[in-house]
Amino acid sequence: MVACIGRGRGLLSPAAVLASFLLLSHAAQAQTASQLLGGPHGVVKSANGELLEGIMVQLIAQKSAIRTTVYSNADGRYEFPKLEPGTYTLRIARPREFHPFVREKLDINGPAELADITLTRVTNAALLPALPEIAAQMTGSEWLLRLSGTGEEKRLLTVNCNWCHSYQQIFRNRYDEHGWAQIVNRMTKGAGSPLINMNPRGRFNDEDTAKLVKWLATVRGPDSKDPPFVALPRPQGRQTRVVITEYELPRLELATHDVWGDSKGNIWYSPHRSSYIGRLDPRTGAVKEYRVPAVDAGVLPGTHWIYVDKNDIVWGSENWAHSIWRFDPKTEEFRRVRWNVPEPVNSPMGGNYALDPEGFIWRARGKAVAKIGALTGDTILRFPLKKFTGTYGSAVSRDGRYFGGGAWPRDGVVVADTQTGEVFEPDCSANCGPARGEFDPQGNYWSGGRGGMLVKFDIAKKRLFEYPLPTPYASMYSAQADKNGEIWAGEMHAGRYLRFNPKTEQYIEYVLPEPYGIDRETWIDNSTDPVTVWYVDHDGWIVRIQPLD
């Protein structure tokens, strides 16, 4: 059923209204690495005079709250891009082994040499004390490194509890075995992240459930001790050659999911459990919200997938209400298409879809890859599956020939050749868990693995290749290829963002200013050189990653 359901109500947050008056020059679409330099600069050193590499130096604009982070090199030097003149806060993001450093009300106007930043260590020991202010800076990987337990016990957590929230959200709590049993039962039997509908069968069997509960009660029980933290290495070399900008969004608890860019340089984002979608103007930090018209009574609102087509029409999926909507920013009108799916409302319908060059939606569900009319919801073409019931993610190659998707919760991928009708369903290693992904310029399908594995289906060899992540206990939700064939993805729970070169099979990990990296979908601006990478963290801020090479 198709329904025209009126205009979205555009709302501008108070901070965004103020930010919109900033007189920023309109940046050209193309950029070079030199354009990411030329701003305030300085040196970071320790109290004993040692030059420090890999320190995250951050300036926060008072008017817009935009956070810009750069990294000190091997000589302790850092350099910001050109910034709008104004008042800023200078701070060190995630100082970890060092005491916090903050300098308020700093006037910035041009490429000034800033006073040296001198940091004092919290401890000279290799391990960091379990202080609350240090715990708040540590990644999920570092939390797991500090806790006792077998590889089997930790693996139960990392392959079953890693895609809806941070590990910190779990480990900040303390319960006895009965309390953890109630939580694990709710989390593993709830349908999707809302946990409204309950399934009689959990995500794993009773024996494994008991093992996980016992381990949690041991390491995070009422009387368990807090061991010191093992800190992952700071960035070095090419890892420091990046500028990361963060844009705070105007609401709490948005559960933000996807981003996509339009032709005007705006970034659209989808809150997973909210009635609003939003548009960020990166030049000013202004955020405009649009209210998606109400869903039926008793149904959770929220937009899962978001995509901007070549005409700047915005598309989104309502995973709990089981609809697709189309939004025209010029008229601010939504049009909703209700999908007939077997799942009950408030349970996920499989909301990660793909739009092909001709405007059709693709997905794999119900033992078939399907081409669907975007404005009707009618199935136009089907390619039956023999092994998997469907895919978690959906992608269409740039020429429109291939469909691809990760088969999570099964271990494998689906790739369909829509010209020949061939369908490939290769398996991958146990618990690799490919979910979302995209095609590279050569037509290879890449997928982010829930079990910490980057997966490629080589379209020429018709084979699957696996590349394990370099950081322990890291997970992935998605992976995206740029114009050069390099692969980008957030390392969930590791506080890192990966860049993988398939030619050399080498990773670069950019360390993030916040200890999360919960990235559900990446949008890459291929018009810049180097490319510019965007994602929205699940906890409510949009991130721009600009490598210098």
Task: Locate predicted features.
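Beta-rich, blade/repeat-based domains predominating
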Residues: 252-263, 296-310, 342-358, 387-400, ...
